[in-house]
């Protein structure tokens, strides 16, 4: 199975929708994805991700299935005490690096001003719910790997979501620290990341990264780019 992860286009965060630029980016992403053999499209329930998914759905004449657990994750203080930059994951990862911490060693997340961040429970939520979703697709989590238990795993699906929730998903699937993924991937608008999993029924498998953070479709072809 191929799982294509796509971040939403340039957003109006206040109204939770795409800006005109975001719609341009989403249309370009749809053209980029039209020949990938996508058989099913999933999306976060948030408007900016769903509107991005609709562009691809229209090109492929498909419907979009919403996955509630892939809404953007929350961050902030869990106890009202001080937390760096309100717990923003990308700012937090950069600050940890500036202090000399390794993002591959999560020991620094256990102490102030990092430990009281609600983002940790959010990441755990995405991990638990993603296991249920992946099992419905034919992949049952066993330890750090996945057992192929389905009969229809030789296909391609797409999931449109957010920088935070997709990083949480990748963190779990790839067995890598969440804050490391925030720094290592940090997806652009409509950036595409592709994972592949073996379809050999009964076997154990782990995801292979085929593409990471590919946003060439909005960096060329006349579509402006804006962070």
Regions found by a protein language model. Give the residues of each.
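Flexible, glycine- and charge-enriched loops at secondary-structure boundaries
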Residues: 15, 19, 23, 116, ...
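Short glycine-rich phosphate-binding loop at a beta-alpha junction
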Residues: 39-45, 148, 156-159
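Acidic, low-complexity terminal tails and accessory targeting/binding regions
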Residues: 73-92, 140, 144-156, 167-227
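Alpha-helix N-cap/helix-start capping motif
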Residues: 46-50, 163-164, 189
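Active-site metal-binding loops of divalent metal-dependent hydrolases
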Residues: 9, 163, 213-215
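Phosphate-handling substructures
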Residues: 61-139
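Active-site-proximal alpha-helix that buttresses catalytic centers in soluble enzyme cores
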Residues: 2-71
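Conserved histidine-centered catalytic loops in small-molecule metabolism enzymes
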Residues: 39-69, 92-101, 196-227
